[in-house]
Amino acid sequence: MIEIGKTIIKFPPLIEGILIKRYKRFLADIELDDGEVVTAHCANTGPMKGVLWPGGRVRLKYSPSPKRKLDWSWEQAEVPSHNEKKKCWVGINTSLPNKLIKHLIEANCLERQFGQISSIKPEVVYGLERKSRIDLLLYPSIQNEDSRKIFVEVKNTTWCDDSLALFPDTVTTRGQKHLKELMSVYPDSRAVLIPCISRSDMELFSPGEIADPEYGRLFREALTKGVEVIPCAFGFFIDHITWEGTRPLKSSR
């Protein structure tokens, strides 16, 4: 088990620079600290509310490959924290949260919530019309009292209001559908939503119904219909990511 505050993933040091602009959803121009201006791929196609700061510091991964159109990937952004005297690095790569949560489960960091897990399958087809894919499907060990499969949907969470982490940061019909799909698998299986809070300065999690009122309504309905919510927080550094523990849920308005 990985202790809170300890490293969960290590990687080569990222390259720092200054964000010039983000455009066409997938692209960002960044001036590196040596003065070179590069164009990086931005995996987060949403509005990036609260974390998009032109002139702010960012961190990039350099991974040239003939298979890639761009050699650079935007990984992290430095933003003002709710503590005005501090800043916080935020993970903005939306392909990372599934890997982080899978690491957590494999390291038994969520054993209290899930028990022993014998296997994990990613991107399994499920849902009312069999057209959705669940992020992680967990198969419990035979030692578990609850033998039901566990459907886990992971959401990258970067927006906040003071110390309250919020998801979504815009209207998301896809996210609304995921809540409906989770409700449909209960009670035959367990249904779990994990907001992956990609910053270490948040104290609570709540649905971002200011941005998407319908999502907030469905979120509260899901809670009454057996869907579990386990917000998990992480800290982002230049060469590693730390496990910062779970956060309480604030489901009321």
Curated annotation (Swiss-Prot):
CDD domains: SfsA-like_bacterial (cd22359). InterPro entries: SfsA (IPR005224), SfsA_C (IPR040452), SfsA_N (IPR041465). GO terms for molecular function: DNA binding. It comes from the Bacteria. Belongs to the SfsA family. This is Sugar fermentation stimulation protein homolog. It comes from Prochlorococcus marinus (strain NATL1A).
